[in-house]
């Protein structure tokens, strides 16, 4: 009898371990957050080919057309449509910045997501795919194309913003698109209208979307030690046409105008997602990714929310959209919070300084890493010093050092004020979801050891 019980337990143990370790346990419609995102244009095509999805999508768009969320929630047909779409690729779809059908993709995304939140959100989720590249990738390309590696003493005295413009002129595509936006933004329309801002913005968008970042970043985020260099950096986007105006509008009003346009709304949401200051990272950036923040910042240039350097000071980095919080009334606190995300943003400041310094940081968190963009914002977060030297800007020595260290699984930060070496990031975030996966916590192997322990105890008791 005891032997029979033991045999049954062994059989049960084998089946239990097989089911727990089986990859099929990770699959199923209930885990739609794990599904890799499809671009919204393709997702729309897939939905249109399926009658159930297509009809439900039309129903949901009709439900959201009235913009009355409470009415939609009370309507069973609207809720049924939403439940069906939540299990389709359309619900999790994302877009790529600069893609061929970007506007169409974003229109599809917002047609679903605009009405699903109650009221106006301060921070909106980004419709763009997450950035996986790092600044170190840009450094390597920039050093190859620009031929950097000069004597540090000579480099310290050079105007890096001027060098960046010269490097752009050596590339046909960069030179062509830069000449185009300079010509358009400098073209006076009349004595009372200095330029056609709409055309200027379009030309700037084409430049920053179509020219590789190893050129655009060097022009936009070049490090400076004197006022002449800093002024050239400020003039990069031709601010007299693209940025400044006779009067500064209220920042919340400007945000409202931006959010009426799908492209502008998406770029602003992407900036908040990638540059919003975080308590939970060393660099104050979400996932310690400087590249994602700088890319999101550059992505806003050429829209109503275009940001720029507020002055030509070489010792401090302060950027802002052309707006103020005058006339905010009882919304002044919200307005100031919105403006501080630009003017007092440690993530953005650190990212700009890191690029000018030729450094990047990867860190291993001491504790669990949560989604950085959901953390409460730090009002005052210590940032890197402002007076970083130009001598290390995009230098070959910096890249060589980082490369040699990377071979050992480390990355170095070689700024004069801060010398750190961090191990590679060991916590992974699954693309297309907000979930964080710890290295040793895979779902398929989470419970077999516990089951084995329990069953061993039961076997021992029965044997006794």
UniProtKB/Swiss-Prot annotation:
<feature type="propeptide" description="Removed in mature form">
    <location>
        <begin position="445"/>
        <end position="464"/>
    </location>
</feature>
<feature type="disulfide bond">
    <location>
        <begin position="325"/>
        <end position="335"/>
    </location>
</feature>
<dbReference type="GO" id="GO:0009897">
    <property type="term" value="C:external side of plasma membrane"/>
</dbReference>
<feature type="disulfide bond">
    <location>
        <begin position="224"/>
        <end position="229"/>
    </location>
</feature>
<dbReference type="InterPro" id="IPR037193">
    <property type="entry name" value="GDNF_alpha"/>
</dbReference>
<keyword id="KW-0336">GPI-anchor</keyword>
<keyword id="KW-0325">Glycoprotein</keyword>
<dbReference type="InterPro" id="IPR017372">
    <property type="entry name" value="Glial_neurotroph_fac_rcpt_a1/2"/>
</dbReference>
<feature type="lipid moiety-binding region" description="GPI-anchor amidated serine">
    <location>
        <position position="444"/>
    </location>
</feature>
<feature type="glycosylation site" description="N-linked (GlcNAc...) asparagine">
    <location>
        <position position="413"/>
    </location>
</feature>
<dbReference type="GO" id="GO:0043235">
    <property type="term" value="C:receptor complex"/>
</dbReference>
<comment type="similarity">
    <text>Belongs to the GDNFR family.</text>
</comment>
<feature type="disulfide bond">
    <location>
        <begin position="258"/>
        <end position="264"/>
    </location>
</feature>
<keyword id="KW-0732">Signal</keyword>
<feature type="glycosylation site" description="N-linked (GlcNAc...) asparagine">
    <location>
        <position position="52"/>
    </location>
</feature>
<feature type="disulfide bond">
    <location>
        <begin position="40"/>
        <end position="93"/>
    </location>
</feature>
<dbReference type="GO" id="GO:1904399">
    <property type="term" value="F:heparan sulfate binding"/>
</dbReference>
<feature type="disulfide bond">
    <location>
        <begin position="161"/>
        <end position="222"/>
    </location>
</feature>
<keyword id="KW-1003">Cell membrane</keyword>
<feature type="disulfide bond">
    <location>
        <begin position="63"/>
        <end position="78"/>
    </location>
</feature>
<dbReference type="Pfam" id="PF02351">
    <property type="entry name" value="GDNF"/>
</dbReference>
<feature type="disulfide bond">
    <location>
        <begin position="195"/>
        <end position="241"/>
    </location>
</feature>
<feature type="glycosylation site" description="N-linked (GlcNAc...) asparagine">
    <location>
        <position position="357"/>
    </location>
</feature>
<feature type="disulfide bond">
    <location>
        <begin position="185"/>
        <end position="200"/>
    </location>
</feature>
<dbReference type="GO" id="GO:0035860">
    <property type="term" value="P:glial cell-derived neurotrophic factor receptor signaling pathway"/>
</dbReference>
<keyword id="KW-0675">Receptor</keyword>
<feature type="signal peptide">
    <location>
        <begin position="1"/>
        <end position="21"/>
    </location>
</feature>
<feature type="disulfide bond">
    <location>
        <begin position="95"/>
        <end position="105"/>
    </location>
</feature>
<keyword id="KW-0449">Lipoprotein</keyword>
<feature type="disulfide bond">
    <location>
        <begin position="275"/>
        <end position="293"/>
    </location>
</feature>
<dbReference type="GO" id="GO:0016167">
    <property type="term" value="F:glial cell-derived neurotrophic factor receptor activity"/>
</dbReference>
<dbReference type="GO" id="GO:0007399">
    <property type="term" value="P:nervous system development"/>
</dbReference>
<dbReference type="InterPro" id="IPR016017">
    <property type="entry name" value="GDNF/GAS1"/>
</dbReference>
<comment type="subunit">
    <text>Interacts with NRTN ligand and RET: forms a 2:2:2 ternary complex composed of NRTN ligand, GFRA2 and RET receptor. Also forms a 4:4:4 tetrameric complex composed of 4 copies of NRTN ligand, GFRA2 and RET receptor, which prevents endocytosis of RET. Interacts with SORL1.</text>
</comment>
<keyword id="KW-0472">Membrane</keyword>
<dbReference type="InterPro" id="IPR003504">
    <property type="entry name" value="GDNF_rcpt_a2"/>
</dbReference>
<feature type="disulfide bond">
    <location>
        <begin position="168"/>
        <end position="174"/>
    </location>
</feature>
<feature type="disulfide bond">
    <location>
        <begin position="251"/>
        <end position="323"/>
    </location>
</feature>
<comment type="function">
    <text>Receptor for neurturin (NRTN), a growth factor that supports the survival of sympathetic neurons. NRTN-binding leads to autophosphorylation and activation of the RET receptor. Also able to mediate GDNF signaling through the RET tyrosine kinase receptor.</text>
</comment>
<feature type="disulfide bond">
    <location>
        <begin position="47"/>
        <end position="53"/>
    </location>
</feature>
<feature type="disulfide bond">
    <location>
        <begin position="285"/>
        <end position="347"/>
    </location>
</feature>
<keyword id="KW-1015">Disulfide bond</keyword>
